[in-house]
Amino acid sequence: MRSSNNLAKSFALALTSSLTLSALMAVPLQLANSARAASPAAKSTKLKPSKSGDSAQFVSRDATLGIEEYKLPSNDLSILLCERHATPVVTVNMVFRVGSRNEAVGYTGSTHFLEHMMFKGTNIHDPLKKTGLDDVLKKVGGINNATTSYDRTNYFELVPKQAINLCLELEADRMRHLLLRESDRKAEMTVVRNELERGEDDPSQLLEMNTFATAFREHPYHHPVIGWRSDVEGVPTERLRQFYNDFYYPNNATLVVIGDFDKAATLKEIENKFAGIPKSPKPFPPVYTTEPPQEGERRFTVSRGKELARVMVAYHTPRGTDRATYPLDILQSVLGGDSRKSSRLYKRLIETGLASDCYAANYTLKDPGLFIISATVQPGIDPKMVEAAIQEEINKLSEKPITAEELRLARSSISKRFRLSLSDPMGLAQSLTEGIAVGSWKWWASYPRDVQTATAQEALDSAKKFFLDKSKTVGYYLPTDFKTDAAAIAQIKPSKPTENQGDSSSAATSQTNEATSSAGSQTDRADKAKTWQERVERFRLPNGMTVLLARVAEGADSGKASKNAIRGTVAVSGKIRAGDFYSQIGKSAVPDITAELLTYGTKKFSKEQISTQMEEMGVNLDFSNGTFFHEFESEVAAEDLPKLLSLVSSEMRQPKFQQSDLDLVLKLSQAAIKEKMTDTGEVAWNSLVRSLYKPGCVYYAPELSKQMEELSSITLSDIESYHQKYYSPGNTVLAVIGDIEPAAVKKLLEAEFGDWKGETAPAIKVEASGLIDRSGKASKSKLTTELADKANVDIAIGKPVALSLTSDDYLAAMIGNAVLGYDSFACRLAPVRDKLGLTYSISSHITEPHYPYSPWSIDLSVNPTNVDRSLEVVRKIVADFNKNGVTSQELATEQDHLAGVYLVGLRSIRSIAKKLTDYEQLSLPVSYMDTFGKRVKNVTLRDVNKAAGQYFRLDDAVTSVCGSLTIKAEPKQSIAK
């Protein structure tokens, strides 16, 4: 996929990701040669209109999901439409049935490389003429990107509803009119290579890539999705053009449209824009290579870097549409991982101290795939012990059936997760993409029903059939200086029994039907309100806890009950003033450890009961620590809201902190810090903030080795004291948004939180005194940190800025920053990637906008040989930006862009709930959500240039560089004056 930042990161899938179905539920350009470089179809200068008889033909409908299928008879383009009118946004998603399985040696990675090239222009939409896809979409706001996987490629736009026709035009145009210029390929090659290098520096990605390459010797799944380096570097433009002309046709594609649109008008637009595109003139090249049965265990070891060791075990499985997928997905759920404290792998690997994280995944692919179990080994532990433990758990699955309770929980979890994943239009689009890739959208739609028919006996039979030693592949990732530690091994605890001890009904309440609107009145004032100020009800409990409620559901405005299975969900978001701001010097990890321990058991629910109930509801509920706040967010089926709130209340109010749990979390934290110490991005950032802030400032972070030392001083009393002091109703804001009956939810909240007591924390105030005085320092101050065996270098350039969300000039500064470097495309910094190919990703941003003096930074990653050149280009661009300022055209474009992005950011009830808690904690009114677009449009050019000139200069910025560098003039971890 293309690099992304900001909102795009919230849902973009990793390049090589293949979602398991049970988890669904994130060089100079030469114009002179462009005509000759174009494919024959690119000669067209405008899209052909449809002819009579090109009307889309209805094919089928899934009434439960609200999806309708159509087909264009002229070219067999498949069309899936799903109307969602709860929020005014639309997702347009084009899925091509081509992935890395369609490649061979010599042109591996072509699918992904071509995905990048699909943004490089047509005669109509050409970035060189400032009419490219990113240029025109920026004017309407929203998000666009693409992802590539083994079996498919998809291109998507998420935009305000009025931009739907533009998105359809863009997808129709690039389907057959791509220019594919040689100059574009040359520039983009180094971008793709940098993406590849970033993956090489990630031990988990590297291990997975080698696992597939070892398990598959003949089938194209052997090749990494991104391709082999020499193919990426050497593939000629003509080979990419051949690939494009082989697969990019309407009869190899499915167009998915989801959101707030008019069906009849949209179908007409699709007909007009796509019906004139011809279908493929020849059959699509088949994939006829099959993987023969494996005849013996295969092993490999990757030795590099200094990250924690990893173990991966993989077994061959049938194609995704095989009946065995359902029991295998049940087994995946039963094995679980580090995020589920009641699962078998958690008990066997995490609780015993063998591993710091782990997971099981059934890779559901078009052709036979893999079932993978992976674990990150705790420092000092022999990976062979982890492998042996994994093998023991696999053997248990083949020896006796899973329990009836495990089967029930797995079925419930898979069904609920599937349902909840569809509440976000982008989540639905991506889920459909995976289903189309594996089999068909109908197979995907029937999946949650069919998986309910899987039995414990089928799970046992599948384990016996597929989890065989002779079809196993085992991979180790070992750091170059790997050693085992007898003391660490001696601390391993015996595993606990896997029987479930939870009481699935213990959190249920009698108010379930009352709290969900499908059983209550549809006449609330909020149902017919149009503004968020009118729709959101804000009130305080007598103890000072602030609550925000809003009914947001399909059919709410019309007074119709929400009976659709993909609706009827509720988002809950909480924000507590209890972040790093309230930590003590020498105890910086206490806020983070406290947040982590909240899910380890309460006075009412054991750790396993909490995990079991989360699994039953198909949700996660984790508390995270931030600079100023602790927060959590979750989304449940409406009928599960009382159960979720009961758990939230118990975890926030009555956590049962125990020494054994603290010991485990401290050990996991040590492993996490050790990983950070080998991450170029983490190390570069840590060096940067230590050069900008004094100890005691909230934005300062101790050196990573110091953070490791601090963990040993944290006691149970530190955790208890911190929780008692900062977890109180007066510090807490809770938002409940979705398919609710507000009056019933009020009663529920009063019952769960009404008798909660506690003191309100001191107000947050960040002073300039926490900054290191850099006046008079050289403008090119640079920190360099050497890390061995790194293919990629991370660069962070930053400085503190006296700016926050409540600043009068915040919006002006926000616009100025967006002009400079909102993302890697269509901004001032874009040439660093798009023209020069120096980086996969570059952007500028304010790190923590809640309060002033957080870092404003420019972040990028580059090949080690491109560090100096990249820094020179960035400095030149910023200097020009400072000298000439923002133009009136850039202002107008960014005003429209940011207004659209903001609207798209409120596309789901989960994002709405989070935005409400953010604003409430900063004492900003709900009306800010209604007036954002207007306020952005009211910002003047003078305002923007004044703010940009004040905040976004590099004169006093510090540059931090980390990677495998050859630095002769500067000592390691030094600052050059």
Where are these regions (language model features)?
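Bilobed periplasmic-binding protein-like "clamshell/Venus-flytrap" ligand-binding domains
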Residues: 458-478, 730, 945-963
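M16 family metallopeptidases and their MPP-like homologs
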Residues: 82, 86-113, 129-174, 206-230, ...
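N-terminal secretory signal peptides that target proteins for export/translocation
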Residues: 1-8
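Alpha-helical scaffold elements lining the catalytic groove of polysaccharide deacetylases
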Residues: 231-240, 710-714, 719
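His/Glu-rich zincin catalytic helix
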Residues: 27, 31-132, 156-159, 168-170, ...
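Bacterial N-terminal signal peptides
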Residues: 12-30
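Short, conserved secondary-structure transition motifs
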Residues: 193-199, 289-302, 410-421, 636-637, ...
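Proteostasis/folding factors centered on peptidyl-prolyl cis-trans isomerases
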Residues: 67-71, 237, 375, 456, ...
